[in-house]
């Protein structure tokens, strides 16, 4: 967005954050203290900070393509007194994560913004450790009172099909959000 500063404020909007329920999402993911996590499309850190508190002996890679989002995150990390967050400037084709390194990749309200998603998520598989997971939180399809207009969202079933093509199987879904789908995927063994 052209006005990144106002976009950052929108992302940190108290009502939006409350609807996303970051603490509950992080708890549901049952991460070990020493887990290595990537928050893909981290923005100013709505999920990065709760993730970092959960994996207190691990690392959270805060991955974003917008440097000013990462600058906003750095300020919030200093305020939160956390030292296990690594900001990573990504490109639209790769998040720049090491191979076979990450236990969980969390993607919140970012999936629809990625280009060539099947190939992108196929590449992400190589960055997961054995047993690694991909968690996606994305606005539900159709007309909603909040979130992006319907023309910016994927049709029902489209994300699932893309992820299957990219080599993932749906592990489970959580029903804790009124306006978001919350899914956990794992690399398919027969891919």
Feature roles, as predicted:
Residues 95-104:
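A short acidic, Gly/Pro-enriched loop at the edge of an enzyme's catalytic core
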Residues 1-32, 36:
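Class I SAM-dependent transferase core
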Residues 103-117:
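A short SAM/SAH-binding and catalytic strip from SAM-dependent methyltransferases
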Residues 135-160:
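Conserved class I S-adenosyl-L-methionine
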Residues 118-133:
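A short glycine-rich, Lys/Arg-flanked "PGG" loop and its adjoining helix->strand segment in the class I
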Residues 38, 43-95:
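Class I SAM-dependent methyltransferase SAM/SAH-binding core
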Residues 31, 54-55, 128-129:
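A generic alpha-to-beta junction signature in SAM-dependent methyltransferases
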Residues 172-191:
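Core SAM-dependent methyltransferase catalytic element
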């Amino acid at each position: 967005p052209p006005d990144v500063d106002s976009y950052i404020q929108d992302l940190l909007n108290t009502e939006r954050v409350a609807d996303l329920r970051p603490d509950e999402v992080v708890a549901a993911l049952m991460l070990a203290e020493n887990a290595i996590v990537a928050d893909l499309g981290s923005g100013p850190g709505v999920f990065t900070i709760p993730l970092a508190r959960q994996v207190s002996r691990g690392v959270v890679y805060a991955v974003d393509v917008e440097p000013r989002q990462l600058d906003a995150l750095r300020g919030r990390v200093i305020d939160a007194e956390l030292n296990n967050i690594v900001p990573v400037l990504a490109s639209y084709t790769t998040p720049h994560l090491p191979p076979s390194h990450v236990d969980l990749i969390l993607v919140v309200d970012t999936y629809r913004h990625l280009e060539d998603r099947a190939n992108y998520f196929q590449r992400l598989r190589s960055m997961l450790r054995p047993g690694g997971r991909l968690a996606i939180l994305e606005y539900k399809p159709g007309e909603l009172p909040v979130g992006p207009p319907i023309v910016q969202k994927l049709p029902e079933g489209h994300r699932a099909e893309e992820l299957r093509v990219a080599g993932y199987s749906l592990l489970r879904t959580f029903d804790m959000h009124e306006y978001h789908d919350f899914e956990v995927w794992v690399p398919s063994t027969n891919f």
